[in-house]
Regions:
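Catalytic beta/alpha-barrel core
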Residues: 168-172, 193, 221-228, 233-241, ...
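Alpha-helical scaffolding segments of alpha/beta enzyme cores, especially the outer helices
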Residues: 144, 148, 240-254, 278-282, ...
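Conserved phosphate-binding/catalytic region of the ribokinase-like
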Residues: 1-98
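Distinct, well-ordered alpha-helical segments
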Residues: 180-183, 269-284, 299-311, 332-336
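Short beta-strand/loop segments at the ligand-binding rim of alpha/beta enzyme cores
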Residues: 187-190, 255-259, 269, 313-328
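Active-site-adjacent beta->alpha loops and helix N-cap segments on the catalytic face
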Residues: 231-251, 297-313, 329-332, 362
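Alpha/beta catalytic barrel-like cores
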Residues: 92-233, 289, 318, 330-339, ...
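Conserved, mostly hydrophobic/aromatic
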Residues: 120, 262, 293, 351
Length: 394
């Protein structure tokens, strides 16, 4: 019979005298790590003074899950994953193909998310390029500008008591590679874009395999993808975009990177409180569970719908971050006042609202490097304080 025995005294002369604690039959794809998994499961119960039978049940399940996957120690299940499997093992004949189980395994390996994120987004490429052309400046200067934006974040940290774990940045590797390299090793939340700017249908920058591209990224870097999407788009366009997002999500599952999906409805559509909620529901129905969502300013009704949808479809989602869409500081603060009421909203990643005017002045040589850094840092601090004020209210 399948399973194991626990011997607490002398070893009997015959295995027929041993009590077998049965496990579950699975297809064996790999044998490496099975022993480690078995012992980790057993100790999970034994060290909590649970019965030997219960401890052995955990051991059998952990071993079964590891041998059914192409992996070694990283394939060992988390506690939530283990209990889900034990509750549903009779319906899970092939654990490696069970989507719910695999999702629990994926989220169980994530590092702990910051409670809040105060993000400065400067992963813009087209907007910076267009600004450089408008100001008759060599686009090569954008690289320097993005390094200065890193200094703005550092200055804001120095002037406030915010934790570095709550600091976020969105930086591209087209113009921001030096900026990215300069923050290597910092405990900041870092996200990088993969979308070709302004593409609709969605295309990935640089072409080729998105999975191959992610292989060179540090695992701590979050994959950010902006998609201009509306659930009422023409069916051909919608399916093309959805295929791209599914490909990206699969690549993130394979690479182990977290995914932030940014949704912006095209301006041609009339604003509707159900647009974003319907979009989220559509992606969840497609089996796409991003770790993060990045969403525009919304009304109370939309936030409530979004909260219900996320908690219903993926209670392990890290949360929602607000985007700015180049709105005024006052408009952004108004969006904070609404979003901060909802537990699912974890903060913001705002860009042009904080730096665009100063970037233009810098390119036109109306301000120097230090003035630019200070201006953006002060704006950034102002938004962080505004977010804190809103959260204290609720």
């Amino acid at each position: 019979p399948l399973g194991c025995t626990v011997i607490t005294s002398d070893i009997p002369d015959s295995s027929a005298n041993l009590e077998v604690i049965k496990g579950n039959q699975v297809e064996i794809l790999n044998v490496l790590g099975a022993g480690d998994a078995f012992m980790s499961g057993f100790l999970r119960g034994y060290l909590r003074n649970e019965s030997l039978e219960k401890s052995a049940t955990y051991a059998n399940a952990c071993g079964a899950l590891v041998v059914s996957r192409h992996g070694c120690a990283p394939a060992i299940p988390s506690e939530k994953e283990l209990f889900y499997y034990l509750d549903n093992a009779h319906n899970i004949l092939n654990p490696s193909q069970d989507k719910a189980l695999n999702h629990l395994h994926r989220v169980g390996k994530r590092s702990k998310a910051p409670t809040e994120i105060y993000g400065l987004a400067f992963d813009h490429r087209k907007q910076f390029y267009d600004l450089a052309i408008e100001c008759s400046v060599d686009p090569g200067h954008i690289n320097t500008l993005k390094q200065l934006l890193v200094h703005s974040v550092e200055k804001a940290i120095h002037k406030t008591n915010i934790s570095q774990e709550n600091v976020g940045v969105l930086i591209d590797d087209t113009y921001g590679e030096d900026a990215l390299n300069s923050i290597a090793g910092k405990p900041w939340w870092i996200a990088r874009p993969v979308e070709l700017p302004s593409s609709r249908p969605l295309a990935f920058e640089g072409g080729g395999s998105i999975g191959s591209k992610l292989q060179s990224w540090p695992l701590a870097h979050v994959v950010k993808c902006l998609i201009f999407y509306h659930p009422d788009d023409p069916i051909e366009l919608r399916l093309k975009q959805e295929r791209q997002v599914k490909e990206l999500y699969s690549a993130c599952i394979q690479s182990g990177h977290q995914l932030l999906l940014e949704l912006i409805p095209p301006a041609k559509y009339k604003d509707d409180i159900t647009t974003i909620p319907r979009t989220l529901k559509r992606f969840y129905h497609l089996g796409i569970n991003p770790d993060w969502w990045k969403l525009p300013a919304l009304q109370d009704q939309s936030w409530q719908l979004i909260s219900d949808i996320i908690f219903s479809h993926d209670p392990h989602c890290q949360g929602v971050l607000l985007l700015g869409l180049s709105a005024s500081m006052e408009a952004v603060k108004e969006s904070f006042a609404i979003a901060s009421k909802y537990e699912i909203c974890k903060g913001f990643t705002i860009g042009r609202t904080l730096f665009y005017d100063s970037a233009k002045e810098w390119m036109q040589q109306q301000i120097n490097d230090q003035e630019f850094v200070s201006s953006v840092a002060n704006n950034y601090i102002e938004l962080i304080e505004a977010w804190h004020d809103c959260k204290r209210t609720y």
